[in-house]
Amino acid sequence: MTDMTRRNVLKASAAGAGAALVPTAWTAVARAGSQAPPQALAAGDLALWYDEAAGTDWLRALPIGNGRLGAMVFGNVDTERLQLNEDTIWAGGPYDSANSRGAANLAEIRRRVFADQWSQAQDLINQTMMGTPGGQLAYQPVGNLRLALGAASGVSQYTRTLDLTTATVTTTYLQNGVRYTREVFASAPDQVIVLRLTADRANSITFNATFDSPQRTTGSSPDAATIALDGISGNMEGVTGSVRFLALAHAVTTGGTVSSSGGTLRVSGATSVTVLVSIGSSYVNYRTVNGDYQGAARTRLNAARTVGIDQLRSRHLADYQALFDRVRINLGRTAAADQPTDVRIAQHASANDPQFSALLFQYGRYLLISSSRPGTQPANLQGIWNDSMTPPWDSKYTINANLPMNYWPADTTNLSECFRPVFDMVRDLSVTGARVAQAQYGAGGWVTHHNTDGWRGASVVDGPLWGMWQTGGAWLASLIWEHYLFTGDVEFLRTNYPALKGAAQFFLDTLVTHPTLGYLVTNPSNSPELAHHTDVSVCAGPTMDNQILRDLLDAAARASEVVGVDATFRAQARATRDRLPPMRVGSRGNIQEWLADWIEPERTHRHVSHLYGLHPSNQITRRGTPQLYEAARRTLELRGDDGTGWSLAWKINFWARLEDAARAHKLVRDLVRTDRLAPNMFDLHPPFQIDGNFGATSGIAEMLLQSHNGELHLLPALPTAWPTGQVSGLRGRGGYTVGVAWSSGQADEIVVRADRDGTLRLRARLFTGAFTVTDVSDGSTPATTRPETDVVQLTVRSGRTYRAARPGVTPTPTVTPTTPAPPTTPPTTPPTTPPTTSPPAPSGARATYRVTNSWSGGFQGEVTVTAGTTAIRGWTVTWTFANGQVVNQVWSGVHSQSGANVTVRNADYNGALPAGGATTFGFIATVNGSTNNPPTNLTCTTT
């Protein structure tokens, strides 16, 4: 489409990133006798798997990424396709979005708004406040790497899997008596995409590989084993494309031959092949595009070429699992998990499939790790995956819901590092937004409206109905303080404080006194994407603005105290905060969306912006503001449960904050349907936007742990559909790592590790009955108080772990995965011989090893570590396998394996044990043949 046509389509379909296109549901039919394949079992059911290739359907392909590089893997037998992205390939180039006519017309715009002349105000905004250009620029693809492998006939036993525990896509099938296997992963340590092809018959792999792209590109063969694609990003909105990129694909073979000419890579008669894909970009930052993109691509490829496949894989796993393995969750398993993933989605409404909620939760974490790493761009509307030159809403950053939602799970699900790109962006926007603040408002500080892009556009775009919203930068800046509440990192706060202060300063300069109400209000602004009267959204002081600014000004004031600066500014911020309009309850018993008690023309609108105060903020709480709490419930009832995918996901979080477990779980189930999840579990609105995935992960976390109200509230919205389960590794504000195990709908055991000294307040039903609290580090019983019947309070120390439990509950601060079903045969009977036990150590610990389940080609085991006569701070268990067993996954421990020798060290929450205390870790392993002898040299050492 042309730019103008595209913009008109946006407006016709409601312009904001949450606007829904016509739903196009898909179908999948259950397989009789279906069983999960070995790859899914090895992942403890944390895998997406299918018995059919993706064909040409992008929403059936499987995503991999390392934060910077992304690929969609199709898994076709005849032609493998890797659709490639690099996170800095944006249309156009650096531009100044500020409109110099804005400041001179601002007073008249405000007069019209206060006079209820909203249409006339919007007309003047269109003439004088729109950015230059009037739309922002799109995230674009690199292209495709295609491997032509031959005919797809004679294929059986086809399986395609995305293993969330290893971040690897595996395709395997039998063709003409040969077992072919492909593995694809994106390595963050080595900054390449790795495609590994193997066959169980020598000299069976033959293919031709080529690049293609919708961009302006040139293909070539720089050497005898490499092909190249050199290109430049597209033009858009009158801005010339200026991001150069180079993609390289290099083949290393065992057996056979490899050659390259004319942009085609030819492999013939190989037994195994490793294809390395490296991509370089000339994008340096939002102002500079003259980077050595060719040198970057070649340097990364050359470095990866010196590393064998085993080391590439092990480095990738060590990096990825250090993040992913922090959180374990088990919500139970039923036979529904034996169906392919697309079937599970299609039949979810009529099935009991609690494990799918765990899979959905962990998939969101996987996607965030794969699309957002330190030093990369933030995850955009599609994360990092896009195959279109003109993707929906440009696949950029929509700030009035979508970008913040992408990062709601970052801190709560223990992925703090993945949050860093957002703060890099905020610092960039404090520069571009300062230019807009001065030119369009005559103000200091900085401002960003409802969207930004790779060039950090900060002005009003897409028309005033959507774009004339002032508090985008304010919301992003408030995330600085929110992140600090989790981490306690004063240096982080000091580094980002200028951006936080600048966002607040803009509103100190621009808020105006409402002529009749006397409050300080934004003008002009809107309640995101929703008209209050026909075709007009512009107003003064919408409720969401007031809520965001209350958070922003409070955060800026508190941050200035922590870093010890700006006492005068601090006082101004607090005085301004106190003059903001309070939330009001309207005539329908709802939270008013605007200062006036208007009834919205679109009553089931996807945005519920005026409940920002309920979530993600803490301005509306059950115990602190009961009247507003009930009004928030009424607001949600009026808005209804339906909506776009991301809207449903936000509503999970809302209902979790209302502690309504049944309604929150209903919305989790509502999200799992074929018009809201694609076959590859990408969230649909439709079309695909990734924020729904992240919002769902956040919502499930909120159902299990909340920390926004000065306490850790365990299982605040636990549904009856999850009667028994465990979760560990969640994070709470105040610097806590939390685990909880439950049965019959209430906690049996709570484990909390403190990052810093302080007072810990715990709320759970557990405390309404008999319980014990133990300092696990030394076995002592800390003093506790009971300020409420379901609350205990105690003093905690940094680095120590505390356990609360019902009497008689064995110390097991771990999460046990669901027992996997066998792939083809019933499980064998666990060994009747006594478990293997390490030599006793009276003042140390002993380890007991046993097999708990087994199947053809694999087994599940567990090891219990029991402290001796003295408390321990940490433990390490080692053993030697006798039959070529390989550990694929460990929970509640950190493992490595060298040959037959396995080492498992404690996780961060279960190393400290009191005298006589015990903890258990589990694992999944593969085994060649039927012999699975107990290990030798089992030892346990302690610190």
Language-model region placement:
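C-terminal capping/lid segments that line or modulate ligand- or cofactor-binding pockets
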Residues: 61-84, 88, 108, 128-129, ...
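Ser/Thr/Gly/Pro-rich low-complexity, disordered linker/stalk segments of secreted
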Residues: 810-841
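Carbohydrate-binding surface patches
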Residues: 188-195, 199-200, 735-761, 861, ...
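Solvent-exposed beta-hairpin/edge-strand motifs
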Residues: 762-778, 878-891
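Aromatic-residue-lined binding/catalytic grooves and analogous aromatic/hydrophobic interfacial grooves
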Residues: 36-465, 482-484, 515, 562-565, ...
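N-terminal export signals
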Residues: 2, 8-28
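Surface-exposed beta-strand/loop patches in extracellular or lumenal glycoproteins
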Residues: 205-213, 753-767, 871-882
